[in-house]
Amino acid sequence: MAIVSSKQSPQPDGSKKPSQAKSVKKSVEHSKPQQTDALLQPEAVQEEFVGKQDDKLRPQRFDEYIGQRELKEVLDIAIQATKSRQEALDHLLLYGPPGLGKTTISLILAAELGVNCKVTSAPALERPRDIVGLLVNLQPRDILFIDEIHRLSRMTEELLYPAMEDFRLDITIGKGQSARIRSLPLKPFTLVGATTRVGALTSPLRDRFGFVQRLRFYEADELGQIVLRTADILKAKITSDAAEEVARRSRGTPRIANRLLKRVRDYAEVKHSGEITQTIAQEALELFNVDPCGLDWTDRRLLTVMIEQYNGGPVGVDTLAAATGEDSQTIEEVYEPYLMQIGYLNRTPRGRVATPAAWTHLGYQPPDEQMRLLS
C-alpha cells in the first residue's frame, strides 16, 4: 500500500488536399516518437513525491498557488470557517484532467489548517484492511487524500460511507449466524478525493462530499508565471518571452509546463550558454516535436487519420482507436480534452469531427460539407 505523509520530507505537408487522402495514408503510419508522448502526457509522472526537487516545485500555501482563482476563493472561505469552529473541513471531491494540481491542493489545505495529510491512491487500497488501517490512525481534522478515487473496490467504498457521514467504521466480525457488526469510532477527518472521471463515481459516494469542485485548464499567462517560478527554483535563467513560449505549448497543464521547462533547460545547457531565450525554447520544443499549439505527434496523427481516412468525421472513438492503434480510453482522457479545448475536435451524436481549425492547422482545405456539418 503506497502512502505518503505531508510531514515527510510528423506534421502533414500544407500542399495536400482532401482528395489526396487515400494516396497519403502512409503518412500517418510512421513509427511513433516515444519521447514526445512522455513529455506531453500529464500522468507520465506520478503525483507522489519523487525527490526533494519535485517537492520544492509545489507551492506550499494558496498565496503561492497560481491559477484556479474561483476554487481558491471557495476553499479560503471554507478554511477560515473551519478554523474558527475548530471542526474538520467538509469532504472535498476534486475532478478534472490530470496534472492540474489536485494533490498539491490537498497538501496546501493541510498546511493551511495545520494538520497532517496522508496521500494514497485507490489502486493501492486493494483490501478493506488497507483503508481501515489508514482511517483508525488519522488524528483529529487530518486530511486523507485518495487519488483515482473512482477506482475504489466496492467493499472499500462501502466502508467509507459511515466513515464519511458519522466518523465510524462498521466492521463485520465472524461469519454466518454468528456474524455481528462492531462499530469503531473515528476521529473527525477530511477525505479529499481526486478523479479524472467524476461520472464513474457511484452516486452514494459522490453525494457524501460536501464540496465538489472542478479544476480547469490553465490560461497561457498563468502557465507563464508558473514557468518563471519553476525556473527561479531550478536556478535556470529564462527570459519572459521564452517562458511564454513554453507556456503556450504546455496544453494548459502545469505538470507539462514544468516538464517541458526541464527539457528546454537541458537543451540550453548542452547546445548553448545556458540562458533560455525564446529562440532557444523554440528550437528545443521543435526538437521534442511539440508544435506551437502544444500538439505532439499523436495529436496530429489522430486528426490526420480523421481527415485523410474519414474526411474529417464523424467517426466513433472505437473506430478511431482501431485506426490509430491507440487505446480508446487514452484517446478520451488524454488527447480529446485538450483538442476540444483549443477547438480542433468536436463531439457530436454521430461521432468525433475534426473542425475547420484542425484542417487548417494541418495544412488542409476544409470541404464545404464539413463546414455545413458544424454549422
UniProtKB/Swiss-Prot annotation:
The cross-references to Pfam families, in alphabetical order and at most eight, read: AAA_lid_4 (PF17864), RuvB_C (PF05491), RuvB_N (PF05496)
| GO terms for biological process, alphabetical | DNA recombination; DNA repair
Residues annotated for Mg(2+) binding in this entry:
103
Q: Where is this region: Small ATPAse domain (RuvB-S)?
A: 219-289
Span list, region Disordered = 1-44
Q: Which reaction does it catalyse?
A: ATP + H2O = ADP + phosphate + H(+)
Residue positions annotated to bind ATP are 57-58, 99, 102-104, 165-167, 208, 218, 255
**Do you know which InterPro entries this protein is assigned to?**
AAA+_ATPase, AAA_lid_4, DNA_helicase_Holl-junc_RuvB, P-loop_NTPase, RuvB-like_N, RuvB_C, WH-like_DNA-bd_sf, WH_DNA-bd_sf
Q: Where in the cell is it found?
A: Cytoplasm
Q: Where is this region: Head domain (RuvB-H)?
A: 292-375
* GO terms for cellular component: cytoplasm; Holliday junction resolvase complex
Chain residue ranges for the region called Large ATPase domain (RuvB-L): 13-218
Q: Where is the composition biased (Polar residues)?
A: 1-22
Q: What are the entry keywords?
A: ATP-binding, Cytoplasm, DNA damage, DNA recombination, DNA repair, DNA-binding, Hydrolase, Nucleotide-binding
EC number(s)?
Answer: 3.6.4.-
* GO MF: ATP binding; ATP hydrolysis activity; four-way junction DNA binding; four-way junction helicase activity
The entry marks the following residues as binding DNA, namely 347, 352
Quaternary structure (record):
Homohexamer. Forms an RuvA(8)-RuvB(12)-Holliday junction (HJ) complex. HJ DNA is sandwiched between 2 RuvA tetramers; dsDNA enters through RuvA and exits via RuvB. An RuvB hexamer assembles on each DNA strand where it exits the tetramer. Each RuvB hexamer is contacted by two RuvA subunits (via domain III) on 2 adjacent RuvB subunits; this complex drives branch migration. In the full resolvosome a probable DNA-RuvA(4)-RuvB(12)-RuvC(2) complex forms which resolves the HJ.
Physiological role: The RuvA-RuvB-RuvC complex processes Holliday junction (HJ) DNA during genetic recombination and DNA repair, while the RuvA-RuvB complex plays an important role in the rescue of blocked DNA replication forks via replication fork reversal (RFR). RuvA specifically binds to HJ cruciform DNA, conferring on it an open structure. The RuvB hexamer acts as an ATP-dependent pump, pulling dsDNA into and through the RuvAB complex. RuvB forms 2 homohexamers on either side of HJ DNA bound by 1 or 2 RuvA tetramers; 4 subunits per hexamer contact DNA at a time.
Domain free text: Has 3 domains, the large (RuvB-L) and small ATPase (RuvB-S) domains and the C-terminal head (RuvB-H) domain. The head domain binds DNA, while the ATPase domains jointly bind ATP, ADP or are empty depending on the state of the subunit in the translocation cycle. During a single DNA translocation step the structure of each domain remains the same, but their relative positions change.
UniProt family annotation? Belongs to the RuvB family.
Q: What is this protein called?
A: Holliday junction branch migration complex subunit RuvB
Q: What is the lineage of its organism?
A: Bacteria, Bacillati, Cyanobacteriota, Cyanophyceae, Acaryochloridales
Give me the gene this protein comes from: ruvB
